[in-house]
């Protein structure tokens, strides 16, 4: 009885298992079969054609799975139809790709970073669905993943490449659709891949980001949009370069024009000297005046570098540059200022020494102007002239600079102690140091001049250049020698270039034979006051040092109030030190800002004592003592502004 019941049950189970095979749901069976045999069910060689592959597959199928009996099939149909609906079995549909059908190609928009490119040694157009499935299974085996996680995205026929990507197993919503190519390649076993897919030849695997990104970017660049972008970029670059070149050329032109104007303003024109033309055979050899012939004119131009250039011109064809100082057309000898013969040796024109060694008429007239020029201004006139800057500029241009020629200073190597080679002390008012060595005249030299004060008071000031590293000892020797109570410094240590060295100590310093002690520092709004004690042997001197730092670079201050306050403080200290030496004033060259301070100080004393001021006479007096004092027309205007401001603050009782 038990055998009768067990046999139909066993037949039923076999029928169900066979029905699963015929309905193509035989994955479980194949897996078991493959597991037992430890080798794949179907092996295809790449040299076999499709027909031979089909024959081998069908023979293997019949050999392993013999056809069931008709009774079993009829029984099995009833069960399979109810549980496993299946279409008619056609092996060609499973193994061959129908024309126009790409069941395994997904063509999804996967990012390049997630795509893997596999390069094969066989033509892509020879691949069919069967080979693609084998390829997918081999890649999955090399990755240790399920075949369902490997997706063939695109076939590249020209390069014999297959694009694929790997999806994560059990992907949750919100997770990326494909894994990163770099991450997949790290887990790929290339040896397993090549052993599983020998029919595909040599296989090379790489991420698309490295293989194709450069090509894609190049394609984008040379597309229509990329071409336009390149053209726009080149156009912008050319425009920028052109603009920079234009700006550079304009800047060069402005600098050249500025240099030419500066050189033109600094040129010194000496008075034309009439030269006698060669006498004709009909004239007497000793005749000096030949009215029937146009005399030649010798015009000497001294450029800012101190080079003299003699120039001979005929007055009949060339007009002489007008001189700002006009001479009355009186007698010939008076007009010339000398009875020296006008006959010159033309071969000696290259040597300009005689023009320097002998005082020229032009220089004499310039000195006469400096000693006699005057324009007294009352308070209303001072306010009016301050409002007319062009009148002040014209007046300033008439004042001779009275610079000194280096050959007038008979001291060897004196140039080593000059900050600027064209700014030299006037020999008549030069400060001479007590010689350290009688045989060394250079030890007596310092670039400094005594300056007269109000009413021509002798040695009221000393105007000097900013000390250099090799003249600091000379500077302190001069302060000690002259017993100066006050030092006024109107410059920073550096304004683009060095203007002055730090010549005082922080606490204590020894300079030559003079010891300098700083005993107090007082910081004011626009200047710093230091109380100094100078010692030499058993003797001491007290000196106040004013360092004015509010003067802007390359222009005059906007307000004269700080300079006026400095001047009043210095004047108070000077009066408190009656009987001592001159006030030492310096900037960098010792003529520009130094001249402004001294001229303002003298003018304020004149306003206080007389109620009027003669700024023109004051500046001329300064230039007699030191050439170039009050260096520019802007500084000349600034002096008038400072005097006008001081005058407005004077009370009627103060004016005498």
From Swiss-Prot:
Entry keywords, A to Z: Cell membrane, Cytoplasm, Glycoprotein, Hydrolase, Membrane, Phosphoprotein, Protein phosphatase, Proteoglycan, Receptor, Signal, Transmembrane, Transmembrane helix
Parts of the chain that traverse the membrane: 226-248
Biological-process GO terms, alphabetical: ERBB2 signaling pathway; in utero embryonic development; negative regulation of epithelial cell migration; negative regulation of ERK1 and ERK2 cascade; nervous system development; neuron differentiation; signal transduction
InterPro entries with a match to the protein in the record: Prot-tyrosine_phosphatase-like, PTP_cat, Tyr_Pase_AS, Tyr_Pase_cat, Tyr_Pase_dom, Tyr_Pase_KIM-con, Tyr_Pase_rcpt_R/non-rcpt_5
Top-level class of the enzyme under EC nomenclature: hydrolase
Source domain of life: Eukaryota
GO CC terms of this entry: cell junction; cytosol; plasma membrane
Tissue distribution of the protein: Widely expressed in the brain, most abundant in cerebellum, midbrain, cerebral cortex and hippocampus. Also expressed in heart and skeletal muscle.
EC annotation from Swiss-Prot or TrEMBL: 3.1.3.48
Disulfide bonds listed in the record: none
Catalytic activity: O-phospho-L-tyrosyl-[protein] + H2O = L-tyrosyl-[protein] + phosphate
Extracellular side, ranges: 25-225
Gene3D superfamilies: Protein tyrosine phosphatase superfamily (3.90.190.10)
Signal peptide positions on this chain: 1-23
Cytoplasmic topological domain residue ranges: 249-656
GO molecular function: protein kinase binding; protein tyrosine phosphatase activity
All copies of domain Tyrosine-protein phosphatase, residue ranges: 392-646
Glycan-modified residues: 23, 128
Modified residues (Phosphoserine): 271, 338
Induction: By nerve growth factor; isoform 2 is induced in adrenal tumor cells 2 hours after exposure, levels are down-regulated 24 hours after treatment.
Active site per the UniProt annotation: 587 (phosphocysteine intermediate)
SUBUNIT field: Interacts with MAPKs.
Task of the protein: Sequesters mitogen-activated protein kinases (MAPKs) such as MAPK1, MAPK3 and MAPK14 in the cytoplasm in an inactive form. The MAPKs bind to a dephosphorylated kinase interacting motif, phosphorylation of which by the protein kinase A complex releases the MAPKs for activation and translocation into the nucleus.
Recorded family membership: Belongs to the protein-tyrosine phosphatase family. Receptor class 7 subfamily.
Name of the featured protein: Receptor-type tyrosine-protein phosphatase R
Species annotation: Rattus norvegicus
